[in-house]
Amino acid sequence: MEISFTRVALLAAALFFVGCDQKPQPAKTHATEVTVLEGKTMGTFWRASIPGIDAKRSAELKEKIQTQLDADDQLLSTYKKDSALMRFNDSQSLSPWPVSEAMADIVTTSLRIGAKTDGAMDITVGPLVNLWGFGPEQQPVQIPSQEQIDAMKAKTGLQHLTVINQSHQQYLQKDLPDLYVDLSTVGEGYAADHLARLMEQEGISRYLVSVGGALNSRGMNGEGLPWRVAIQKPTDKENAVQAVVDINGHGISTSGSYRNYYELDGKRLSHVIDPQTGRPIEHNLVSVTVIAPTALEADAWDTGLMVLGPEKAKAVSYTHLRAHETVLDL
């Protein structure tokens, strides 16, 4: 199903976004106190803003959130050798490999959006990510050779991965023994959506939850207004706001090349790898922000658009996202 109400921000200036719990002007109604819970997961931070819950409920909820996120990390991590994902990666078997419904859904969404971005969003790019030192392995001491890059590219490709649904059981199947799936590009989005489902299960209908750069929300904030997200430029000394958007009931995610990088042989190397070249991206698009029905979808789309660069990303967003607004800040 196409996304008919997505807003895409394609920015050639560095961006980040934070949840806004307050209206930019005084509220006309009595405000409800917003409790903010925070913690760590997946090498990043999580946050939940919830109006109108007491201290006892907050403590109980924080424990449930952390437990769930720890389980998500155990499902998706490439840093934990005993994670569900790494057990699949380490297996040389070409037979269907049983996985959870959650894993199958994440991979299905990733493959779908990967196809719509002409392979730019590629969850099999892990060998290249590791080669360039952005995975569990250490950074290289020199720029990888073309031979090394080609060898790793031969182990990648969305066409080598299939999701199978049979008799209430889901499977992943690869046709390359060394295929390595890396879900770090969509893990935060999935976890944010999972937190939103936890809020619903707990009877909470007003919340803003985030994991890393992915957010999901529902209902009104403490001022009785829709949740709003400020998109800012971290390179701006004044932290000027690029845009403020309402995300009520939607997911939002950002991908950027400005935070996770290192310099080697005089070159600045981004963690965003282009599956076509096998190298870090070199274009001038620094960040992409996407609003979509779910944070998982937004997380997948922003990665693909980030890889494509400003011109191709703009074309793809209009073709597949039917975007309401595209912003280029050059």
Descriptions of predicted regions:
Residues 320, 327-330:
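Single conserved hydrophobic/aromatic residue that forms the stacking wall/gate
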Residues 6-9, 329:
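Intrinsically disordered, low-complexity repeat segments enriched in small/polar residues
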Residues 9-16:
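Bacterial N-terminal signal peptides
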Residues 2-5, 17-322:
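Mature catalytic core of soluble alpha/beta enzymes
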